[in-house]
């Protein structure tokens, strides 16, 4: 069973519907006691990093997530949920994240080196470019996936970046280390590629994919 963490800022409906299409059992909960029964976790997210971390800390979910990961439970962060996995974000002032992966979340510049402006938020379909092999990307094609974001991750740990996309800057699109994974894009809105990634994550949870 997959536990979808409900902290009031997630795209719960689309994620749960994707899991239903794949016929995977799931629960949606804000209760660590219920979520503890899940074999793997999904941390969705839409909105402000600062607000999300405040809620996660106030509800005890931040502590629960970190403890679950340390105990070996697989975790997948989606969009803002992926950003929350990292050390900190500069959105609305510097805010400490979950610190499960090394890196900082910064704003997409919106201006090229030549001074030309481009649209932020980054909204639409962009192509994946694979960087490192991962069970999360097994039998996944380097096709287009759907992004909606104004911030992106910068990290000195190149091994964490499993796949990138480009929006004037290189955007870590899929990240992973140990039992912690994340996608900056929305797999549940990314057609066959996104569904395959969710399917691979479920296989990781079931122990069919190597971590």
From Swiss-Prot:
It comes from the Bacteria. Keywords: Amino-acid biosynthesis, Cytoplasm, Glutamine amidotransferase, Histidine biosynthesis, Hydrolase, Lyase. Pathway: Amino-acid biosynthesis; L-histidine biosynthesis; L-histidine from 5-phospho-alpha-D-ribose 1-diphosphate: step 5/9. Heterodimer of HisH and HisF. It catalyses: 5-[(5-phospho-1-deoxy-D-ribulos-1-ylimino)methylamino]-1-(5-phospho-beta-D-ribosyl)imidazole-4-carboxamide + L-glutamine = D-erythro-1-(imidazol-4-yl)glycerol 3-phosphate + 5-amino-1-(5-phospho-beta-D-ribosyl)imidazole-4-carboxamide + L-glutamate + H(+); L-glutamine + H2O = L-glutamate + NH4(+). It holds the Pfam family GATase. GO terms for cellular component: cytoplasm. Coiled coil: none annotated. PANTHER family: IMIDAZOLE GLYCEROL PHOSPHATE SYNTHASE SUBUNIT HISH. One of its GO terms (biological process) is L-histidine biosynthetic process. This is Imidazole glycerol phosphate synthase subunit HisH. The active site is at residues 79, 186, 188. PROSITE patterns: GATASE_TYPE_1. GO terms for molecular function: glutaminase activity; imidazoleglycerol-phosphate synthase activity; lyase activity. It is found in: Cytoplasm. The keyword Hydrolase applies. Its EC number is 4.3.2.10, 3.5.1.2. The keyword Hydrolase applies. IGPS catalyzes the conversion of PRFAR and glutamine to IGP, AICAR and glutamate. The HisH subunit catalyzes the hydrolysis of glutamine to glutamate and ammonia as part of the synthesis of IGP and AICAR. The resulting ammonia molecule is channeled to the active site of HisF. It comes from Geobacillus sp. (strain WCH70).
């Amino acid at each position: 069973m997959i536990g979808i963490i409900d902290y009031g800022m997630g795209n719960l409906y689309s994620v749960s519907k994707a899991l239903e299409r794949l016929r995977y059992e799931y629960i949606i909960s804000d209760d660590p006691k219920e979520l503890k029964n899940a074999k793997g976790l999904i941390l969705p997210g839409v909105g402000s990093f600062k607000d999300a971390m405040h809620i996660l800390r106030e509800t005890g979910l931040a502590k629960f997530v970190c403890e679950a990961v340390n105990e070996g439970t697989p975790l997948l962060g989606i969009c803002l949920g992926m950003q929350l996995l990292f050390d900190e974000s500069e959105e609305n002032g510097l805010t400490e994240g979950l610190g499960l992966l090394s890196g900082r979340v910064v704003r997409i510049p919106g201006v090229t080196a030549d001074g030309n402006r481009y649209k932020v938020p980054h909204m639409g379909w962009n192509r994946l470019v694979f960087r490192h092999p991962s069970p999360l990307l097994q039998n996944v094609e380097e096709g287009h996936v759907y992004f909606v974001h104004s911030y992106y991750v910068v990290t000195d740990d190149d091994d964490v970046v499993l796949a990138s996309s480009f929006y004037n800057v290189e955007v870590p699109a899929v990240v992973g280390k140990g039992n912690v994974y994340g996608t900056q894009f929305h797999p549940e809105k990314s057609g066959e590629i996104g569904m395959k990634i969710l399917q691979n994550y479920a296989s990781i949870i079931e122990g069919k994919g190597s971590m």
